[in-house]
Each structure stands twice: as structure tokens, then as C-alpha cells.
Amino acid sequence: GADGAHSWVRRHFKMGRPKELMIGFQVEVTGYQGEDGRLDMYTGSRISPGFFAWAIPSGETTRIGTWSKPDLMGGESCEQLLDRLREDPLWAERFSECREVGRFCGPIPSGMVKRPMIARVALFGDAAGLCKPTTGGGIGPGFAQVDLVTPLLLDALEKDNLSDSSMREITGLMEPMRKDQRRAKALRDAFLTESSDTELDEIFSVWARPEVTELINDIGEIEHPIPLGIKMLRDIPEFRSLTKRAVKAILLG
């Protein structure tokens, strides 16, 4: 089943649930007044509780969105949160000339399900809970899963051996992906989701320091955030207080 976040296949065969489910909302606009080629990120409990909002240049348009967990949103929708961002006096000028040309909304399942493969049944992509806990992206992990398991799956098909034990063996190839998700979520929680607005201000003030910015530029990679996160927890004194939030998941996966 590659049938999305609310996978019928996953539910029918009782293969488990993604560890967390976020909601994302994005509009595509013209007229956003940001720096050319630069991504803008916004944080705070009023606009994206526990997570962040974004404005990403995309050719002639800009993609503006926000995401969060339903239990952190206080009964509000992501659309309401995004409206609040665009109306905030701090940023309103950037959005004043925006004209909407498209909108998108949907669930973001993250945290691999307990049993992504059983006898003669396999889950892929969002159905398996493969979205990144740090960015919500799901295309990259989905393709990575396909590249990882396809050779053994094809071999199992040719041998007509899709038994539960055979599928468990193939699932074992995905355990590093599961551990990476746990570690990335632990870092996200430490730096973002479990931080108050005051703590976020302090974190961003540290990130803005030249030596920290240089560190981020040297080893930071959006597809692989774990090495940077661990190094910041280890080497930057101001971040050591965050270590206890993340250390168990980071070390043990």
C-alpha cells in the first residue's frame, strides 16, 4: 500500500500507526517581499506552536506555509495560524502585496509504523509513516525506502516467498531509517517543539552568532540534520541544557 497518510491497507491489516501526525497548510503566492533566493522561517506559539512557518521562493512565486500537531493548536486550524502570521505587525509588510495562486493542506505522518511489512503486504512512503520529523518532507524518504527494499522484494517475488519471516527480514533493512527518525525527532523536540517562545528567542540569538552560523554552514545539511544537532548540543555551552531532552533517543535510537 502506497495509499497515503490515512492508509486503508495499514488500517485493514493492523500494521500499526505512525508515531505522530502533523497537519500542514501552504499557499503559493506572488508578491511576497523577501530577499531573492532566501528562505524565511518564522517560529512562535501564535503562528506555529511547537513547529515553524516558512516562506520559500519557487521561481516567480513563493510558498508560504505552517505546520503543527493538532493537540498543540488549541482548536485552531493551520489556515488561522497562517492568517495570523500574515497579519502580524512585525511581518505584515512582507505579505501586503501577496496574491494567492494556489493552496494545499494535508496530514504529515512521521515515525515508522510497527510493522511496515507483513506476509504479502508492504507499506510505502506516507502509509508507512516515513515523513521527516524535522521538515515534514516525504518524497525523499519514500524513494530511499524503494531503493533499499526493492532488490530483496523482487527476489522474494521471483521465489514466491512473501511469508511473514521473509518480509520481516526485508523490514530489517529499514531499521536504520527508523532510528534516524527517532534521533531527528529528539533533536527537533529539544530545539523547537518543547521550547517556549522565550527559549526560542534565546536559541535563535545563539544561532545568529558568527561562529555558530559558520558551524551551521560548514556541517549543516537539511537532509541529514543529526550530525549538526549533536555537535551543537556538545560544543555550544548555551545548548547543553537541552541535552537531557534528547540524549536518550539520540544515543539509543
Locate predicted features.
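A general structural signal for short secondary-structure boundary/capping elements
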Residues: 42-49, 70-74, 89-93, 100-111, ...
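FAD/FMN-dependent oxidoreductases across multiple families
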Residues: 72-153, 157-158, 168-169
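Predominantly flavin-linked oxidoreductase catalytic cores and closely associated redox partners
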Residues: 1-95, 109-113, 129
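C-terminal helical "tail/cap" subdomain of flavin- and related membrane-associated enzymes
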Residues: 154-253
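Solvent-exposed, flexible loop/coil residues
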Residues: 33, 45-47, 59-60, 112, ...
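Short acidic (Asp/Glu) and glycine-rich catalytic loops that position anionic groups and cofactors
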Residues: 60-62, 125, 183
